[in-house]
A protein has these predicted regions:
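Positively charged n-region of N-terminal signal peptides that target proteins for export
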Residues: 1-4
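Tryptophan-anchored aromatic micro-motifs
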Residues: 23-42, 58, 64, 68, ...
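N-terminal helix-cap/turn-to-beta initiation motif at the start of protein domains
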Residues: 19-31, 47-51, 135-142
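N-terminal signal peptide c-region/cleavage motif recognized by signal peptidases
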Residues: 15-17
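Beta-sheet ligand-binding and adhesion/scaffold domains
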Residues: 34, 40, 74-142
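Repetitive helical segments and hydrophobic/amphipathic motifs
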Residues: 11-12
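N-terminal glycine/threonine-rich, aromatic-flanked beta-hairpin/loop signature
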Residues: 40-80
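Generic structural detector for well-ordered beta-strands
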Residues: 31, 49, 67-69, 99, ...
Length: 142
């Protein structure tokens, strides 16, 4: 009886640990809303899918993809997206740094710039962002 009780307690604790990890992991589909800096005016919504292999992609913006890194509640994700007229390669580099505030929500700062490009940059934009968890299933990349 004691052994069965010990196994049951261990199973409950393991389930709670996995549940806590799932709440803080960014893996899954997120609604990404970003806002102009300065001013705070709304700019756009996108859908981002964070994958278990530490890569991500957009299911709403064609070709936008990259890699992500998490340290505790800090999340950094960077990548690139084809953008006609942006720099000599028609490409934007992107980076976001934020925090997982509570389960299902994160926010931070986001920037995009023409890459490669001569200074002064022809495209250099800065935003704040919020993200809301949509679910474990991601739509296909656009």
């Amino acid at each position: 009886m004691k052994k069965m009780l010990s196994v049951l307690i261990a199973a409950v604790l393991a389930t709670q640990t996995l549940h806590a990890f799932a709440e803080t992991s960014p893996v899954g589909s997120w609604q990404f809303a970003y806002y102009h800096v300065p001013g705070g005016g709304f700019y756009a919504n996108q859908t981002i899918c964070f994958k278990e292999d530490n890569t991500w992609y957009s299911s709403s913006q064609a070709g936008w993809k990259g890699a992500w890194f998490q340290n505790g509640d800090d999340l950094q994700w960077n990548g690139s997206v084809p953008m006609p007229g942006a720099g000599s390669a028609n490409n934007l580099a992107t980076i976001a740094m934020g925090k997982l505030a509570v389960a299902g929500s994160m926010s931070g700062n986001y920037a995009e710039w023409a890459a490669p490009s001569a200074l002064p940059l022809s495209w250099d934009r800065h935003y704040t962002y919020t993200m809301t968890y949509k679910g474990a299933t991601c739509a296909a990349p656009k």
